[in-house]
Amino acid sequence: MELQQDLIPQKKTIGALDHAVFLCMVFCFWFSGYIYVPVFSLYLEDLHFSYGAIGIILGSYGVTQILLRFPLGLLSDILFSLRKQLLIAGFGFSVLSSLLFLMFDSFFFVLAARLFAGITASTWVMATILYAHYFNNGNASKAMGIMQFFTVMPQFASIVFCGLAAAHLGRQVPFWMALAASAAGLVICCFIQDPSAPPANRGTIRVNQYIKDTLRLPKLKLFTILSMTAHAVLFITVFGFTPLYMNQLGMGDAELLWVMSAFFLPHAAATLSFVFLRFTSRIAYSVMLISFAVTGVCLLYVPFLAALFTVCITHACIGLALGFVFPLLLSHVVEISSARLKMSVMGFYQSFYALGIFLGPLLAGKIAQLIGLAGVFYGAGSLAFAAFFVMLAQKRNMIN
């Protein structure tokens, strides 16, 4: 199979307004996807779904991402003009997902709505690399730091608004807020700039060669495995079973807001630090190694906690640690890929870390059903330590 590909991209001039429009779109992208997440597992429990069914629905968010992120990245590398259109289509699926949540409460339609939300998340690969083109090649860490911050900031904002809305207006109100943010994001997305627009000169390249070149990149599989593990931990706990565990402790939506805030404030601070700091490979390695160790210790400690304060402290430490891990891995992936392969590499990376988003909650749901919610945190902590030992074994490869 052969498709036309641009040989030398001609960059458009990007101004402050272009950055502002793009980041507003990013805010809507994640706000619409996460506004209901803090109470989503509680909402599913209100619908009388079992822990196993809740795990399936939570994990389904990763299914469509596994299937679509790599093909979308590959397709976008070959057909430059589709990048913006695919991102717009992602907002369309977000609108559809919100409508399904509002109109139906059966397992089938709730599952379908979450799958559509996963399709929206799959188009994030377009946004990631489009924004990387807004910066010079030497500023990959800065670009990814800003993107990660504007990923975390709307997630934190969604937690605040979700907690307040759920506590005072009911747990279905966040779905209306998701619908409004999706519609706004769709409109804003129509006005973003694509600085990698195709030139007149075009050549051909085989799709299978693109795939081979992507898979041959050094360290890509290693970074992907580490990211897959970190995302599994995140979606097992904060975006999965932490709210259910707090509910088991007798805490309500107001207390949940405190715990989520404790996680996301240091998480946002850590990601924002990449806008101002530059990390050498050795320092980056040490930071990630310590972060996985801290995450593992805190998660193993969670089942022994019963007070709101201690739950907040442990989640603050987890949030800070993961706040360093995600942008460091993302910037490494951007740096090891050539300009020609950036989208397909990012698609591969995001597609396979979505395995963690899928398998993590799925297995956690089974564990919770068999041995209780404490087992969920033991499993998540074990995953964090597994990543820690992988990094120890690959120290020379990661530093060089």
From Swiss-Prot:
Main subcellular localisation: membrane
Keyword Disulfide bond: no
Keyword annotations from UniProtKB, A to Z: Cell membrane, Membrane, Transmembrane, Transmembrane helix, Transport
One Pfam match: MFS_1
GO molecular function: transmembrane transporter activity
UniProt-annotated location(s): Cell membrane
Identification of the protein by name: Uncharacterized MFS-type transporter YxlH
High-level lineage: Bacteria, Bacillati, Bacillota, Bacilli, Bacillales
Gene that encodes it: yxlH
